[in-house]
Amino acid sequence: MKKTTAIAAVCLACLTAAGCSQNTQAPLSEQPEQTTTAASLSTEDTTIRFTDQAGNEIELDRPPERVIISSIFPIPSVFALFRGSGAEIVGMNPSAMEAAENSYLAKVYPEILNADTSFVQGGEINIESVAALEPDLVIYSAQNPEEKALYDSLGIPSAAFSPAGQGFDCVETYISWNELLGDIYGDNGTAADIAAKARAAAKKVTDITDTIPEEEKPSAVILFNCANGSIKAAGTGSFGDYWITAAGGVNAAAEVKGHADVSIEQLYTWDPDILLLSNFVPASPDQVIKGENDTDLTGLRAVQEGKVYKYPTGFYRWYPASSDAPLSLEWTALHIQPERFADFDFPADIKTWYTDVYGLTLSDEEVQALTD
């Protein structure tokens, strides 16, 4: 009988091992010398030990060469950038593949499009299909702990990556994912380089927004989704709350938790100065302003004043944590505090980031298309 498990929707965002295992720890006398890092790569063998972001202690016989990323959707793009290739990803969630097909990820690492997605059907993981891909490691969301039990049942090594471990700070979350990859692959130097670039870019924004008086911060709401008569707003404990507050605004939806279902009446009560749409909202800002989406938001002050903006897709979707997180923070700040960021040359910053981080040279037209 086939075994399946449900995947939580983002995010966000989300076999017999070929020589890899999660064995119990050896006696101290048999262990290799430990370092001060969370993971250690033995000088006598290739055994790797690390702690994932759910607190699980993992042991692998060697660095994984066949990886499935099941339920934390930004990770394929983060993984490919960290490793300099998407070839090791043999399986990924269909939602992550959809993002890859419509982003710069596939342009930089086209091999990622070869990853299998059939092990997820209707939001369910088929463990037999996972096993058939013979992964050395499965990466899953720490918010889906039931996945670990499924993989453990067949001895499949797995590691949890968390979207929430850094208080939903998108820049620090992205950095923490790279640090965990550094532990897995014994490459903390790459992780440190990524962290330095991301923090330096984000600091340009927060050096300004950290000094803004509360009375000069406009209110904003991010709609995580708005379709088929359902409205989900980003409350406290969400990426959306981080974007708004770090960019110099006040989250009008802070009274709700996470990505919460809210009524149209509640949204009209909040009546924010600015309305932001995540990548998961089907409608465009123009459709919202013209009342062409299936939920009429035209009575909102932000809509009437044309202050409706949608997160772009670059190397990945810009609403969740991603390798474009510093750019996403700048983009949000430009819309929440436009006067304070009037001197920022955002198109130039995009070009610089894409050259320095991805090795891409974008034209003016490509930059315009990315942010439209």
Residue positions per predicted region:
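Positively charged n-region of N-terminal signal peptides that target proteins for export
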Residues: 1-10
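A short, structured surface patch at a secondary-structure boundary
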Residues: 70-132, 137
